[in-house]
Structure formats: structure tokens, C-alpha cells
Amino acid sequence: MNWEMVIGLEVHIQLSTKSKLFSTSATKYGQHQNTQAAFLDLGLPGTLPVVNKEAIRKAVIFGLAVDAKISKDSFFARKNYFYPDLPKGYQISQSTNPIVQEGRLDIETSKGLKTIRIERAHLEEDAGKSVHGYIAGETGLDYNRAGTPLLEIVTYPDFRSAEEVVAYLKKLHQLVKHLGICDGNMQEGSFRCDVNLSIRPQGQAKFGTRAELKNINSFRFIDKAIEYEYARQVSVLESGGEVVQETRLYDADANETRSMRAKEDAFDYRYFPDPDLLPLVITDEYIESIKKQMPLKPEEREAVYREHLAEQEVEFLLSNLEIADYYDKVAVVIGYKPAYNWVTVDLISTLNRAEKEFSSDVVPAEILLEIIANVQKDIISQANAKKVIAEYIDAPSAIEAIIEKLGLKQVSDEGMIRELVQGIIAANPQQAADFKAGKTKLMSFFVGQAMKASKGKANPKQVNQIVQEELNK
């Protein structure tokens, strides 16, 4: 019998907010256990939730980016279950009428273009974390993550292969990073995926019994987990057994899925509206204001880059999002191609020599633009701009002060440069004669000597012009 794979996905993205969904606790990753947990996060009596406006804004941005409907009225609900890392005994989530509904994302596979329907995306708070092995023989509980804002993105069961799933996840991962709503760090849990997989005989309309796969933190492992689970379910059914509705854990080391617990249905969670939170009302004016500030989608950004840059340059920017964001700020002022050279050749190469990673904070875009402006005004040379960048990296201060400190201000006095050039020509009569005899490549020799004699301070454009004039006399 031929079996068809049917998959729906639930992707949890951690929204990039400074504070939690309903409390003022910080959301920074990797802090010492339980140092970022407010009374509300710990479920202590007498505490009330206050919704994070930035989380709502980011959810709306996502909805607009996937052409979804934004609910004008949505509600927060309590999802009730008991687990050690859920101190309140319930999770604040959204059940009916979530904030984002009926979106779509187009993917490219070996079989061509396919549209994946997004059923919903809803806001919810993350749970805490059980920590094993930190205390010998005990399980500790770290509530730093409890209350962190999540957007759970749920698709319809539109996937028919592992290839389609991976293509969708990569596209979604790229999208949320480009939108600036999630950092996409899978190792830190910022982008997590649950796979709901069932099989059915080819041509049958009715769905089979699904298993939910958890604990998959890389695209490669997702592909392997799906292929293993598909083969397992085929084996179960073809041997006369029944697939059980359950949650299964993927073990990357053993490359297998193992039963974790019975899979609950929605009614098991006894959802009901959270009495401590008012309905979430989103106006048309609010949606329009966000539309005006929407960043470009990855495909839109790529199209702009391809108009101005070479293939390799486009690929570099698209695969280095922080650099691309920085580059865009420079490009809008000085143009796409010059900006690429300044950011990659001048800035990044200088950072590499200083053994520093790229960060937009090391040399802010406005500082680089100030250095570029000094070159454009002939205050410093292009070559000396790197020295200014290097000094700023080492000891940030006013650019004008750095130029003065390093003595890099260009000499643009025509009389002084001409006298310098005349002296160099007089000191090199043979080379001057060879130039006049047709060896025009010697032009660079005289320019180089003039720049060396001026310690790099002479205006290169003027040096070139004056050398040419003097040699052609």
C-alpha cells in the first residue's frame, strides 16, 4: 500500500521584547537561575498581568507580513494544566479569535511553488524550565523564561513531505528575523517547532491518528525526525497495529522518536477567558500606522539588492542580517554600491584586523557616515579613513578629534603640493624621461612618491592632477 504523509506545524517564536508578556521582568537569555522572575511569573497571589504593547505590535507585524487577517477583538484565555515549570497552574494564551488568522507563506521546493496556509498565530507566555543535573540527584526549576512572550504560528495540515516542512521553516525563520520580531536562535529556544504527523492511504480524504514530535532544534534534525516517524507509523499500521495519539520526543543521538506522554486535545486544557485581562482591541488606525513602518520582506529586500549589487554581495548581505540592517542605513545616504564597499572593505576588514566581531554598536552607522563625509569633503583621504575607523574601534571619541590626534587632515594647498611634486620629478630625472618616452605607467611611481613625501596627507586627487601637469610640460 502507498502511504501519504500529512503534516501540520506549530512554531513557537520568542518575540524580541525587553520585558515579558505580562510582567516587567527582563527577557535576556543566559542569566543566573531565577534572577529574571517577577512575583507574577512565579504565580504569587495578588499579582495582576499587564499586557506588553510591543509584543502586540510584533504580532501584528507578523500578521501583515503573511497577508493574514488581524483580529479587531481578541481575547486571552487560561490554558489549564499542571507541570512543575508552570507555577500558576495555567498558561495565559489565546484560544478563540486569536490576534492573527488565515495567513499564507509561499515556499519553493523541487516540485515547484506551493502555498502553505497559516491557520492562526496567537500570543502566549512561555513556561519555565526544568534543570536536571545542576543539583546532584535533584531537578531544579528555573523561572527566568516563564512569561517570555511567544507567538505560536499554527499551519493547516498542508505538508506532504519533509522537504516541504524544512523549506517552510527556513522561509519562516528568515522572515521573522528580517522583520526584527525574533532573533531566530534555535539553540537558545527562540525558534521552536512541533511537528504533527499522521499517515493515510494514498487518495484517502480522512486523516490518520497524529503524533506530535517535540525537541527538534535544527532543520537537519527536523528532516530526520519526520522520516523516522513516517517509517515508524507505516511499520505499525502494516503490522496490524494502531498509531496512538501521543507526544513523542526526538533523540538526535539515536535518530529515533520515543513516546513521551499521551497527547491532549483542546478540551483537556479547559480553556476559559482570563478574568484579569480585558479583550484586546486593535483599531484600523493602529494597523495602518504599523503598515507605514513595516520593514521589507526578505524577497522585497533581495529584489532591491539585486538591482544594485553583484550576486555574491547580495548573498552575503542576506545571510548576515545585522550587517544588512547596518548597510541599509549607510546605503540610503551614499548609495548601494559605495555603501557595500565602505561596510565590507573598510569597516569589516578593520574589525577583523582588530579581532572584533561585527556589531552595529562598535562603529554606529552615523559614525561611519561622518567618516565618509570627511572623505567626500577631502578633509581626509580614503586610505586614512581606515585609520580613523581603527582608532574609533580602539577608543571611541569625536571623529574630528581623532583626525586631529592622528594628524590625518589632508593638505589641499595647490602651491605646496606642486612644489613637492616638482622636487620629486627633479630628483628622478631618468623616470621622468622614461615617462615622456611613453612609459606612462610611471605616473603611479611619482604619485606614490608624492604621497609618501607628504606622509599621506596630500590630497590624492590634486596630487594626480599636478603630477600629470608637471610631467607633461
UniProtKB/Swiss-Prot annotation:
Q: Which PANTHER family match?
A: GLUTAMYL-TRNA GLN AMIDOTRANSFERASE SUBUNIT B MITOCHONDRIAL AND PROKARYOTIC PET112-RELATED (PTHR11659), GLUTAMYL-TRNA(GLN) AMIDOTRANSFERASE SUBUNIT B, MITOCHONDRIAL (PTHR11659:SF0)
Q: What is its EC number?
A: 6.3.5.-
The protein's matches in Pfam families, at most eight in alphabetical order, are given as: GatB_N, GatB_Yqey
Q: Which domain of life is it from?
A: Bacteria
Which reaction is the catalytic activity of this chain? L-glutamyl-tRNA(Gln) + L-glutamine + ATP + H2O = L-glutaminyl-tRNA(Gln) + L-glutamate + ADP + phosphate + H(+); L-aspartyl-tRNA(Asn) + L-glutamine + ATP + H2O = L-asparaginyl-tRNA(Asn) + L-glutamate + ADP + phosphate + 2 H(+)
Q: How is this protein organized at the quaternary level?
A: Heterotrimer of A, B and C subunits.
Phylogenetic placement of the source organism: Bacteria, Pseudomonadati, Pseudomonadota, Gammaproteobacteria, Thiotrichales
Q: What does this protein do?
A: Allows the formation of correctly charged Asn-tRNA(Asn) or Gln-tRNA(Gln) through the transamidation of misacylated Asp-tRNA(Asn) or Glu-tRNA(Gln) in organisms which lack either or both of asparaginyl-tRNA or glutaminyl-tRNA synthetases. The reaction takes place in the presence of glutamine and ATP through an activated phospho-Asp-tRNA(Asn) or phospho-Glu-tRNA(Gln).
Its GO biological process annotations read: glutaminyl-tRNAGln biosynthesis via transamidation; translation
What is the species of this protein? Francisella tularensis subsp. novicida (strain U112)
Q: Return the InterPro entries for the record.
A: Asn/Gln-tRNA_amidoTrfase_suB/E (IPR017959), Asn/Gln-tRNA_Trfase_suB/E_cat (IPR006075), Asn/Gln_amidotransferase (IPR018027), Asn/Gln_tRNA_amidoTrase-B-like (IPR003789), GatB (IPR004413), GatB_Yqey_C_2 (IPR023168), Gln-tRNA_amidoTrfase_suB_CS (IPR017958), Gln_synth/guanido_kin_cat_dom (IPR014746)
Which controlled-vocabulary keywords does the entry list? ATP-binding, Ligase, Nucleotide-binding, Protein biosynthesis
| Homology family | Belongs to the GatB/GatE family. GatB subfamily.
**GO molecular function, one example?**
glutaminyl-tRNA synthase (glutamine-hydrolyzing) activity
Q: Which cysteines are joined by disulfide bonds?
A: none
Protein name, per record? Aspartyl/glutamyl-tRNA(Asn/Gln) amidotransferase subunit B
